[in-house]
């Protein structure tokens, strides 16, 4: 039993007997693993000797002769120290090898997760899931994706693939070579020579020396094997550490590009139009958002980079809808995702929106939106009263629309038909002008008091996409059956939550944009009639 225990303690099989420490590094990312690598002490295999000093050589002469008993005690002491030093070195190397092996496995796992093949499969699967959910809950198909300016994912994956392949060619080259491999080769040759002459031993002393030499040589082989394995593992760690940092940087750039250009648009459409999705689809969308969350958004804020729209946009759903011609300048634009039922008004509302010239709005307006001349006049009065101060000497807008002045007594007589109140005793009749004559009489005076401005006849500057689009989502009155729509094709025209203006500070430009947004919503009702379920 003692010989078996001694053989197992010094054998090469005992090197792999220690348990791995992979559980402690399982949840670490690249940054934490890099900091952990810098804290590891590699002096156990990087230096020659770290343990107890060797015994004195035989060339060191003693000052005085000693007895045989004292010499045996000294020899036994040196042998115990030698054995203890070798065992301590083996235990230290085993612990170090177990630790760096766990770190290497975690680095390898992270590198495989960020490899080209894994990332491509995962991102393509997420994009496909989003497209399937939009097709399930809306009327958008693959053709609509091109019409609203969503690019292909392959354009971004090709850039990531090229950078990742160049990164994987890196290899760490340490300054000192692996000298333990050469020593291990020499020690194994000595071990084979020693065991070949085993049958030639006759005396007990030779057999004792053979057993001692074999045990010590076996321990040296184990130590050199451990140090060689630690050296190779440490080299792999330094290689994968650099590769992992570069792959993580490229992976974050890819996630940001895919989210801002493709998946953010899908997520916004899903949030706005999919009111009651299934639980499985909702969980799937949340997992997609969480995958891109660390690099593409902050809590409660999703950033979107919108690409310029094409010059000519045609709706694939209906051929009856007129053609819309949109001309945009190449100005980078950005918008902000808002959660459902949360709409903000931006204070910068100076950019006007042109009316498409090829649209016949009389055919697309609903009966509720057709206004009489008098109602249009009241709308113009409200627009002017928001920015211009009414002169104190002039009557209010509501007062200017009353009938011509008639004495109160006469009106009273007319209302109750009081013949006794009349001075002549006869019924008094009042000739009132008809509605058309009153309108013609009031309109010139109204134009003199408040100059009428034809906003549609004013010259419009060329339309461009500003850096922050005013966040207006038009709504339809409760009496109308038409659901609220967003202006097409710019589905995501919202602004940051911080840019909010009070309602009483709305400018005529904003009111003009409000009217045109409503007209555009009515025009595009046919394209999005299936989105509301």
From Swiss-Prot:
Name listed for the protein in its UniProt record: Calcineurin-interacting protein 3
Provenance organism: Caenorhabditis elegans
Compositionally biased intervals (Polar residues): 359-372
Basic and acidic residues composition-biased segments: 61-85, 373-384
Stretches the record annotates as Disordered: 1-30, 53-85, 359-404
Keywords assigned by UniProt, alphabetized: Nucleus
Keyword Nucleus on entry: yes
Annotated localization: Nucleus
Keyword Nucleus: yes
GO terms for cellular component: nucleus
Chief location bin: nucleus
Superkingdom as given in the UniProt entry: Eukaryota
């Amino acid at each position: 039993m003692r010989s078996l225990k001694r053989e197992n303690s010094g054998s090469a099989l005992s090197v792999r007997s220690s348990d791995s420490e992979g559980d402690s590094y399982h949840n670490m990312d690249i940054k934490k693993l890099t900091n952990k690598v810098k804290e590891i002490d590699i002096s156990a295999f990087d230096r020659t000797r770290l343990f107890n000093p060797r015994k004195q050589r035989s060339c060191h002469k003693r000052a005085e002769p000693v007895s045989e008993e004292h010499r045996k005690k000294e020899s036994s002491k040196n042998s115990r120290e030698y054995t203890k030093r070798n065992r301590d070195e083996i235990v230290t190397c085993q612990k170090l090898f177990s630790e760096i092996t766990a770190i290497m496995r975690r680095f390898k796992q992270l590198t495989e997760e960020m490899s080209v093949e894994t990332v491509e499969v995962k991102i393509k699967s997420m994009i496909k899931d989003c497209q399937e959910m939009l097709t399930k809950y809306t009327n958008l198909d693959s053709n609509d994706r091109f019409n609203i300016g969503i690019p292909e994912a392959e354009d971004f994956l090709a850039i990531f693939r090229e950078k990742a392949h160049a990164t994987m060619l890196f290899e760490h080259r340490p300054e000192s070579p692996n000298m333990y491999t050469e020593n291990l080769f020499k020690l194994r040759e000595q071990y084979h020579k020693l065991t070949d002459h085993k049958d030639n031993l006759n005396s007990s002393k030779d057999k004792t020396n053979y057993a001692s030499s074999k045990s010590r040589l076996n321990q040296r082989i184990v130590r050199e094997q451990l140090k060689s394995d630690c050296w190779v593992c440490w080299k792999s760690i330094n290689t994968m550490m650099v590769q992992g940092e570069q792959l993580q940087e490229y992976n974050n750039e890819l996630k940001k590009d895919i989210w801002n250009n493709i998946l953010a648009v899908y997520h916004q459409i899903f949030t706005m139009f999919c009111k009651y999705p299934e639980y499985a689809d909702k969980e799937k969308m949340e997992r997609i958002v969480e995958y891109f969350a660390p690099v593409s958004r902050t809590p409660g804020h999703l950033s979107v980079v919108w690409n310029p729209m094409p010059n000519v946009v045609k709706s694939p759903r209906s051929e009856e809808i007129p053609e819309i011609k949109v001309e945009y300048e190449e100005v980078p634009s950005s918008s902000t995702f808002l959660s459902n039922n949360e709409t903000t008004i931006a204070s910068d509302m100076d950019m006007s929106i042109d009316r498409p010239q090829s649209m016949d709005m009389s055919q697309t307006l609903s009966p509720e939106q057709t206004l009489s001349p008098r109602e249009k006049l009241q709308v113009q009065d409200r627009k002017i009263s928001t920015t211009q101060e009414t002169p104190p000497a002039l009557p209010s807008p509501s007062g200017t629309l009353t009938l011509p002045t008639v004495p109160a007594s006469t009106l009273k007589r007319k209302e109750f038909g009081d013949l006794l109140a009349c001075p002549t005793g006869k019924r008094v009749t009042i000739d009132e002008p008809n509605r058309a004559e009153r309108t013609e009489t009031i309109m010139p005076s109204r134009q003199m008091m408040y100059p009428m401005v034809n906003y549609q006849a004013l010259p419009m500057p060329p339309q461009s996409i500003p850096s922050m689009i005013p966040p207006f989502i038009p709504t339809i009155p409760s009496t109308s059956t038409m659901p609220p729509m967003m202006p097409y094709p710019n589905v995501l025209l919202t602004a940051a939550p911080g840019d909010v203006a009070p309602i009483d500070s709305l400018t005529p430009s904003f009111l003009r944009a409000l009217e045109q947004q409503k007209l555009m919503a009515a025009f595009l009702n046919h394209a999005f009639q299936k989105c509301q379920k």
